[in-house]
């Protein structure tokens, strides 16, 4: 072992070490399963070490507790040993619970006999009455086993047992007796058990817990010494019987003995363990003053060496050393006297001289050598007289006696005549054995029914009516309207069951009896042609041949009673029918009563829960009772209970089986239709020992028989059982009754009930409460056609099945005729097509009018001969012609992948691996070439190519398989389809590379794996013995974005592995026929399809997008989206596909992948406007007078402010006076001279924005239209000159972002899912408003604009002006460098009014739909906003503001795209939308065409700015639902801090618009600002600093008479807060507020400060 360990330690390659660890882990996992069988308990570490010393393992992860789990593990281990020793035949078990057969691994078919007897009271709970004998009995078998009860017997009892059991040869017995008790020593294994010595006996205490303790007499220990037991006969002379005993195993205090008839040899000495203890000599007198206990030899030697190692030993030193060497657990086994005696012993030994004082033999002369013997004799005599020397005394004190637990066997003699033992009463057990034998004979001898015989019987049943009792016997019972319980019959039933030892009654209620069966026979029901498959269970009906039963137009197949079923029913009473049901996982049946007409009203119903668990609910007049049924439980509903109770079943476990017994008094309704199950068909060409896997076939494709999506789903649909519902089930061609042969579609008989009738749940025991629906006329017609066809089957199908070479498809095509089938190009593969779930009898054509083959690229490949993989998987693959073949794996492809991983060119997870691992991977890929058994499965999406593998993965053991998936979507799909498989069996491809592998590796959709990955994985993972690749070569393959990666130059993996695929499944179960044929794929799903295309999105539909950018953005919005290429694994009834500029860039494979996802509905979402002839319409723009139609403007109701509310009186306050000279000093002090702040132009000089010498006035830049320098600097900064073509090109490229902006805007503003219909009346009203607003201007203003009304004025021309203004924003107050100004664009007046109408129209709709938590400062006043703030704003945390940079010029083509999508969603006429786009792309000034941007003179400027701000905010940030938000143009504020969406990092480079977030703490002096106002808990107040500074500017300009009133009204809102201002404003803001109040008073505006809140400003 040291050599092996050293060799392993010398291995430094991490991959090899990982492989070794994986193999070790697999072995550990297997061993832990074995350990769990014997020891399932959580064992303390010390006890676990003791168990491992005894050869019993412990699971360190177990959490199951037991008071003496370690001793239980020893007991289970001995049971396992006994199980290996017992013969594979019937054995008698004495004093053993039947459940312990599991530990012995005894098969129930051995039919072991249990003879138990109540020796102690606790035995009553151990053994049920079913196998308890009243006295000792003889043993009828050759071998017997006694479990832990031998100590209750003596040697005479054993002899008596052998004498009365002539068949008994061998008796195994376990006994629990600690051998150390014979010496009154403490426990040898104190961590496992302890021993007390009291009351002239000893007590064995497992685990130190008294609950499991046993008291023993010392005489019981004699069993440990027994070697032979001799019986001398009645006369006590000659030995007539000898029993030889031998101990086979000893584990702690548990021992296994074998007693054999005959005089055989047995070891003379019986060893119970190694000798490790010694007894110290008694060196003191009297004798009781010595240490009389045994101590470990190791401890004795340590104490001796210590006592002799120090110079002068003291008694204290010895005591201290003893305490040091002894563990705490050992100290509790010694008394104080014992410790003192031991210390004295070693103190004396330590004091004696250890130097040998006797003569030496070295260097003696001849004389001395001759006289040495005489001298020694004299010395010995002298020491006997005078005493020994010190060294001699020491040697005598060290004569330790070894304490051994080995014992010599003894011979025991017994005489006299033993009493006779009766024969055991095992009638009940023999009855169970007979049931089992009958079942075995029934199942093993069952004859396979051929298809011809089965269908012939079905045809006869369809013509012959079932035989029923004569009408004379059908006497209707007397109706009992009160539905009372038959008390007399119920008492008789309870009495009968109480006397039956085979059942226990646990609950006796007024309407029911609930109990448990003493013994549940081992049995099973095999699904065959007698099985009726319902929606969530399989059913069998047992009864006399003359009886028939059914419900809801369904008739069950009547089967004669199985003997074991009848015997179970006889336990509970007299019954003539039984309904057996096996349920699926989670199956349930609603409340119902067994009150059909075929039963009497006082019928007794007994339900037995044989296997699995379920919940049984009983609803009575007094309430509802619920029981959790486990195997063996039963419930009997008393006579009359069906009239006053209802019962239900739920929470069934997988394969939960029940038997329901009833007495059927009269026939069922004659309208029942018998369900024909045409399964159980032998396939002559595909014979295998393994069960044939057959995929589930699709529903019928007949238009007449197919259940439509809107039709109700039947509750109970009788179909063929899972074993029978396979691809080999015959299929009937249903022909219309009129003989027409149009659209002859396949109808599977197994699916016929599902598509023709509606049923309700079956019985548990009987019916549901709903009434059955009458058969429709169409259903009757279908049944007539079916029955007529079935009657002809015996003559038409006999020849078809006579040949061994014919396959199932021969019968399927019989109705069409052999010529039609042989004419199919793929008729040779028709059997294979059938096994895949397709009929293959249709000719379908693709878009190019070429015939579509269901199977393509069929080839024959050599089969691999060396496959180290599970045989069941290999056989399953062989059944569908997918046998593995040897595939060589390219070293070139593997080395390219390894090099990229090593040099960090690809991957995410592998980049985090250490350098050594990456280098090792690259080395393995470069050096190793592999040939591996591989199966390549190609098939279209939805073809079921992975279905076989998923079934096998769900059933195989853990550790056998690893499934590698390329995408998370595909990983979820596998997890959903294999819910019982451990999740660690499914891995993404990078995780699979760094984690453990398995013997079988499945790579699904392998075309999406990186090129070279498969080869590298095979090179790295030596554990892989079989590789299965599934994929579709027509779908998208992996795309490597890094051009420097070597794998980017490799061909797709499908190009290499296609030649190792036996055939390609070019058929699908997913898509409707129309969709599939459009893709060139065969499909038999005849469904109506829907294809739509529009510029709006369907809500709730899965969305496929061409780019990762858009996918991430949509996911951040909470919409499920996938890329075209990344949607593999998605199957959905409907899907929407986004079309944008990236769509034409996608390959054919990518588009095929996207288009094959939906079943029958596809919606194309076009994100850009349709390219039609819009430009010519713009040339017909009329003159201003012509488009101003004098229509009467709709009178809009004037806004009436709400009645002013009386606010709580706020106490008046007084602000201390502030220093006016220092109020703006923080802004004035940093100012520099005028020219250092002004803008400079080389030709025009400096601008003139800094006015006067007053430092306060210099804080405000004055921008003037006549300032040429500022004008040209503004054009340079704000205007970008381009060409119309460039604008159009930029617009077309921006569609990828515009739709994202709109979808976020739509979600934020709660717009409806579908486009908003155009309202002409609303448009006319908005148009009138715009016209009236324009005509309300002064005449001079209209005259000045006459040029722009001229028809010769270019509609695309813009007159550009510089806006004159004082810049008063607080953030720009006292700026050290003057910034460019703002432009005013004057468009043609017709254009302004047209798009002003469009903006106003969308504003009206926006106002009506705007959510309450969003406020837009448009057509509102501060009072309204203040009230809204108090109701909606959250001041408990931080707030958020957006500060945009160059907001107008940043609204480029992306924002234009957003505006157009928004306009189309509002159903604005196309010509108006196209004109707006043309204007934005062709607008020009005197310098040329300007780039797409926002201009201040446009009609929709404010509304467009506001909506762009909303769209930007919600695209960039996660905005909490219901968060209060304020918007006005480029100003915005939110009542919560916003976190940026991860998708925005992909969108941000495409957007010109930039912003900086401002976070406010919303505390005193730091509240959010909006349009110069502060958002405070008391409402909206004007910023005191900005208000005061602008007042000083107005005061300097001497225009106070015009503005003083407005300043007073703005100040009034804050002034009326009075003392509350202290809670809101900073000290500086309070100073500015106080100074402004003083100014208002000085200018006689103080009276305005006290106006009420609802005052309307004029």
Swiss-Prot record:
Binds 1 Fe(2+) ion per subunit. It comes from the Viruses. InterPro entries: (+)RNA_virus_helicase_core_dom (IPR027351), AlkB-like (IPR027450), AlkB-like_sf (IPR037151), Alphavirus-like_MT_dom (IPR002588), DNA/RNA_pol_sf (IPR043502), Oxoglu/Fe-dep_dioxygenase_dom (IPR005123), P-loop_NTPase (IPR027417), RNA-dep_RNA_pol_alsuvir (IPR001788). Residues 462-481, 676-721, 754-776 are annotated as: Disordered. Residues 574-665 form the Fe2OG dioxygenase domain. 2-oxoglutarate binds at residue 656. Its cofactor is Fe(2+). PROSITE patterns: ALPHAVIRUS_MT, FE2OG_OXY, PSRV_HELICASE, RDRP_SSRNA_POS. This is RNA replication protein. The lineage of its organism: Viruses, Riboviria, Orthornavirae, Kitrinoviricota, Alsuviricetes.
């Amino acid at each position: 072992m040291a050599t092996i360990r050293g060799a392993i330690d010398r291995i430094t390659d991490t991959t090899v070490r990982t492989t070794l660890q994986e193999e070790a882990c697999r072995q550990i996992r297997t061993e832990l399963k074995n350990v769990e069988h014997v020891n399932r308990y959580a064992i303390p570490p010390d006890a676990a070490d003791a168990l491992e010393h005894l050869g019993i393992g412990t699971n360190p992860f177990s959490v199951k507790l037991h008071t003496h789990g370690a001793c239980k593990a020893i007991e289970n281990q001995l049971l396992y040993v006994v199980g290996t020793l017992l013969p594979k035949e019937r054995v008698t078990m004495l004093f053993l619970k039947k459940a312990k057969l599991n530990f012995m691994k005894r098969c129930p078919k051995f039919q072991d006999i249990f003879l138990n007897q109540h020796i102690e009271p606790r035995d009553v709970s151990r053994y049920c009455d079913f196998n308890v004998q009243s006295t000792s009995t003889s043993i009828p078998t050759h071998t017997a086993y006694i479990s832990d009860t031998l100590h209750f017997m003596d040697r005479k009892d054993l002899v008596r047992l052998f004498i009365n059991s002539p068949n008994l040869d061998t008796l195994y017995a376990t006994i629990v007796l600690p051998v150390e008790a014979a010496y009154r020593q403490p426990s040898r294994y104190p961590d496992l058990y302890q021993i007390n010595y009291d009351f002239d006996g000893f007590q064995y205490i497992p685990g130190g817990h008294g609950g499991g303790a046993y008291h023993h007499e010392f005489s019981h220990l004699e069993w440990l010494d027994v070697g032979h037991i001799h019986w001398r006969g009645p006369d006590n002379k000659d030995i007539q019987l000898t029993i030889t005993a031998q101990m086979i195993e000893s584990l702690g205090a548990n021992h296994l003995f074998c007693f054999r008839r005959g005089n055989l040899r047995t070891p003379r000495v019986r060893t119970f363990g190694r000798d490790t203890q010694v007894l110290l000599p008694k060196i003191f007198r009297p004798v009781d003053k010595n240490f009389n206990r045994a101590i470990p030899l190791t401890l004795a030697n340590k104490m001796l060496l210590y006592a002799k190692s120090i110079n002068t030993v003291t008694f204290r030193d010895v005591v201290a050393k003893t305490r040091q060497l002894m563990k705490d657990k050992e100290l509790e086994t010694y008394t104080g006297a014992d410790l003192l005696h031991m210390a004295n012993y070693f103190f004396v030994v330590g004091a004696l001289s250890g130097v040998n004082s006797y003569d030496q033999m070295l260097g003696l002369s001849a004389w001395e050598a001759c006289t040495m013997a005489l001298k020694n004799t004299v010395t010995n005599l002298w020491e006997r007289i005078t005493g020994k020397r010190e060294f001699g005394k020491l040697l005598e004190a060290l004569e330790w006696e070894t304490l051994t637990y080995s014992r010599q066997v003894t011979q025991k003699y017994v005489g006299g005549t033993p009493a006779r033992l009766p024969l055991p009463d095992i009638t009940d057990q023999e009855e169970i054995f007979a049931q089992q034998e009958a079942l075995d004979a029934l199942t093993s001898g069952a004859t396979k029914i051929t298809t011809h015989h089965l269908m012939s019987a079905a045809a006869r049943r369809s013509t012959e009516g079932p035989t029923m009792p004569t009408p004379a016997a059908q006497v209707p019972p007397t109706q009992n309207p009160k539905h009372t319980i038959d008390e007399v019959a119920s008492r008789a039933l309870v009495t009968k069951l109480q006397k039956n030892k085979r059942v226990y009654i646990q609950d006796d209620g007024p309407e029911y009896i609930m109990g448990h069966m003493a013994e549940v026979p081992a049995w099973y029901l095999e699904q065959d042609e007698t099985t009726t498959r319902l929606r969530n269970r399989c059913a069998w009906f047992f009864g006399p041949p003359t009886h028939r039963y059914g419900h809801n137009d369904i008739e069950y197949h009547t089967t004669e009673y199985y003997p074991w079923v009848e015997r179970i029913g006889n336990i509970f009473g007299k019954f003539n029918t039984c309904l057996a049901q096996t349920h699926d996982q989670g199956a349930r049946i609603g409340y119902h009563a067994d009150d059909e007409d075929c039963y009497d009203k006082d019928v007794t119903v007994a339900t037995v829960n044989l296997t699995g668990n379920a919940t049984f609910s009983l609803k009575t007049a007094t309430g509802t009772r619920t029981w959790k049924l486990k195997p063996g439980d039963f419930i009997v509903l008393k006579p009359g209970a069906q009239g006053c109770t209802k019962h239900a079943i739920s929470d069934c476990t997988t394969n939960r089986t029940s038997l329901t017994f009833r007495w059927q008094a009269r026939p069922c309704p004659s309208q029942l239709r018998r369900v024909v199950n045409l399964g159980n068909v032998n396939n002559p060409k595909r014979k295998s020992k393994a069960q044939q896997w057959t995929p589930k076939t699709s529903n019928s494709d007949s238009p007449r028989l197919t259940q439509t999506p809107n039709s109700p789903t039947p509750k109970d649909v009788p179909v063929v059982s899972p074993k029978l519902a396979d691809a080999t089930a015959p299929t009937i061609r249903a022909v219309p009754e009129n003989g027409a042969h149009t659209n002859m579609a396949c109808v599977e008989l197994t699916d016929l009930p599902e598509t023709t009738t509606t049923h309700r749940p079956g019985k548990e025991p009987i019916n549901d409460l709903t009434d059955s629906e009458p058969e429709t006329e169409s259903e009757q017609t279908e049944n007539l056609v079916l029955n007529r066809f079935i009657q002809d089957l015996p003559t038409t199908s006999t020849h078809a099945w006579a040949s061994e070479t014919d396959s199932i498809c021969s019968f399927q095509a019989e109705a069409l005729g052999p010529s039609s089938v042989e004419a199919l190009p793929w008729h040779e593969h028709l059997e294979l097509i059938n096994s895949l779930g397709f009929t293959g009898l249709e000719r379908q054509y693709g878009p190019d009018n070429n015939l579509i083959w269901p199977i393509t690229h069929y080839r024959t490949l050599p089969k691999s001969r060396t496959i180290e993989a599970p045989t069941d998987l290999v056989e399953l693959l062989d059944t569908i012609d997918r046998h593995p073949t040897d595939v060589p794996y390219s070293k070139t492809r593997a080395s390219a992948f390894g090099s990229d991983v090593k040099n960090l060119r690809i991957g995410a997870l592998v980049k985090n691996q250490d350098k050594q691992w990456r280098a090792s991977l690259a080395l393995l890929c470069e050096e190793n070439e592999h040939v591996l058994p591989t199966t390549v499965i190609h098939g279209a999406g939805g073809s079921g190519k992975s279905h076989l593998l998923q079934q096998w993965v769900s059933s195989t053991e853990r550790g056998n398989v690893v499934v590698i998936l390329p995408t998370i979507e595909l990983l979820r799909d596998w997890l959903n389809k294999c819910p019982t498989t451990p999740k660690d069996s499914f891995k993404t491809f990078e995780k699979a590379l760094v984690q453990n592998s398995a013997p079988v590796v499945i790579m699904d959709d392998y075309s999406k794996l990186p090129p070279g990955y498969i080869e590298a994985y095979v090179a790295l993972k030596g554990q892989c013995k079989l590789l299965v690749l599934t994929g579709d070569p027509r779908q998208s393959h992996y795309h490597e974005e890094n051009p420097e990666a070597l794998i980017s130059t490799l061909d797709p993996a499908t190009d290499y592995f296609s030649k190792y695929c036996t055939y390609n499944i070019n058929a699908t179960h997913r898509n409707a026929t129309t969709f599939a044929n459009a893709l060139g794929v065969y499909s038999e799903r005849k469904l109506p399809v829907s294809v739509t295309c529009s510029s709006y999105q369907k809500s709730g539909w899965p969305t496929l997008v061409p780019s990762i950018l858009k996918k991430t953005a949509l996911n951040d919005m909470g919409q499920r989206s996938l890329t075209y290429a990344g949607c593999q694994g998605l199957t959905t009834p409907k899907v929407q596909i986004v079309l944008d500029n990236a769509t034409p860039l996608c390959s054919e494979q990518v588009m095929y992948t996207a288009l094959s996802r939906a079943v029958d509905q596809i919606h194309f979402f076009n994100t850009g406007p349709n390219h039609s002839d819009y430009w010519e319409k713009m040339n017909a723009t009329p003159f201003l007078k012509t488009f101003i139609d004098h229509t009467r403007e709709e009178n809009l109701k004037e806004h009436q402010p709400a009645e002013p509310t009386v606010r709580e009186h706020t106490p008046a306050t007084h602000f201390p006076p502030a220093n006016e000279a220092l109020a703006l000093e923080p802004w004035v002090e940093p100012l520099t001279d005028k020219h250092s702040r002004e803008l400079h132009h080389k030709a025009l000089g400096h601008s003139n924005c800094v006015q006067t010498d007053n430092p306060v006035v210099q804080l405000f830049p004055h921008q003037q239209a006549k300032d040429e320098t500022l004008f040209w600097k503004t054009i340079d900064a704000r205007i970008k000159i381009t060409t119309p073509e460039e604008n159009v090109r930029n617009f077309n490229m921006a569609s990828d972002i515009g739709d994202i902006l709109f979808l976020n805007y739509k979600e934020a503003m709660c717009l409806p899912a579908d486009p908003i219909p155009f309202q002409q009346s609303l448009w006319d009203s908005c148009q009138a408003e715009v016209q009236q607003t324009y005509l309300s201007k002064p005449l001079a203003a209209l005259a000045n604009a006459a040029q722009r009304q001229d028809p010769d004025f270019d509609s695309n021309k813009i007159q550009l002006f510089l806006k004159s203004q004082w810049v008063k924003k607080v953030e720009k107050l006292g700026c050290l460098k003057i910034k460019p100004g703002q432009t005013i664009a004057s468009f043609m007046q017709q254009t302004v009014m047209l798009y002003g109408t469009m903006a106003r129209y969308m504003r009206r709709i926006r106002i009506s739909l705007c959510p309450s938590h969003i406020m837009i400062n448009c057509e509102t006043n501060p009072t309204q906003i203040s009230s809204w703030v108090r109701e909606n704003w959250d001041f408990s945390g931080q707030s958020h503001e957006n500060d945009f940079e160059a907001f107008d010029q940043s609204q480029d083509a992306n924002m234009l795209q957003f505006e157009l999508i928004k306009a189309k969603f509002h159903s604005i006429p196309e010509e108006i939308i196209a004109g707006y786009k043309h204007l934005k792309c062709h607008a020009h000034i005197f310098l040329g065409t300007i780039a797409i941007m926002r201009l201040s003179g446009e009609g929709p400027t404010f509304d467009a700015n506001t909506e762009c701000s909303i769209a930007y905010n919600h695209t960039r940030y996660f905005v909490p639902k219901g968060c209060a938000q304020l918007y006005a143009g480029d100003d915005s504020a939110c009542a919560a801090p916003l976190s940026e969406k991860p998708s925005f990092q992909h969108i941000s480079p495409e957007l010109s618009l930039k912003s900086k977030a401002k976070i406010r703490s919303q505390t005193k002096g730091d509240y959010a600002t909006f349009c110069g106002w502060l958002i405070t808990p008391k409402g909206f107040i004007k910023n005191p600093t900005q208000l005061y500074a602008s007042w000083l500017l107005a005061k300097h300009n001497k225009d106070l008479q015009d503005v003083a009133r407005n300043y007073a009204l703005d100040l009034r809102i804050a002034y009326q807060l009075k003392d509350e201002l202290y809670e809101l404003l900073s000290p500086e803001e309070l100073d500015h507020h106080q100074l402004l109040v003083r100014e208002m008073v000085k200018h006689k505006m103080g009276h305005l400060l006290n106006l009420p809140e609802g005052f309307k400003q004029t």
